[in-house]
């Protein structure tokens, strides 16, 4: 099985999602052909048992799309796993992958919690929801959660129309 994980940053200063990816890759990479796609950073973490690929950021939209599509065609993954939300690059990589009929797993890493959604609601969340985020959540084949209360929050927001 081949899996591509997209994560906006694997920099040491990026926090929990980067640490999660590092731990996950060390074990998952023993079982599958694992590729991690991110953007260049000044201080990336070392991630074992996988191939790390760097693509341009959203600021270079055309280059980002071209390199993402190239990687998809070269690797031909069974699953594309998007590890984030609220960022245009995440929604775009998902959209481009789904246009080529790849299966998508979207892991928001707690970013659908009510307190996160309320933070910068009018300036960031509403525009993101209207432009791409709600559609990305609905179109993912799965939205994994690890805690019961988080699962309830995400299910309520995603499927009740309150997102």
Sequence positions of predicted segments:
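N-terminal subdomain of nucleotide-sugar transferases
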Residues: 1-43, 48-51
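Membrane-proximal helix-turn-helix segments that form the acceptor-binding/catalytic region
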Residues: 99, 122-140, 152-155
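A short, charged, and often flexible helix/loop element on the N-terminal side
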Residues: 45-71, 75, 79-86, 115-123
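Alpha-helix capping/helix-boundary segments
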Residues: 42, 112, 144-150
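Helix-loop-beta element that forms the nucleotide-linked donor phosphate-binding surface
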Residues: 146-163
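Histidine-centered beta-alpha loop that forms part of the nucleotide-sugar donor binding/catalytic region
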Residues: 8, 108-111, 161-163
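An aromatic- and histidine-rich active-site surface loop
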Residues: 79-114, 131
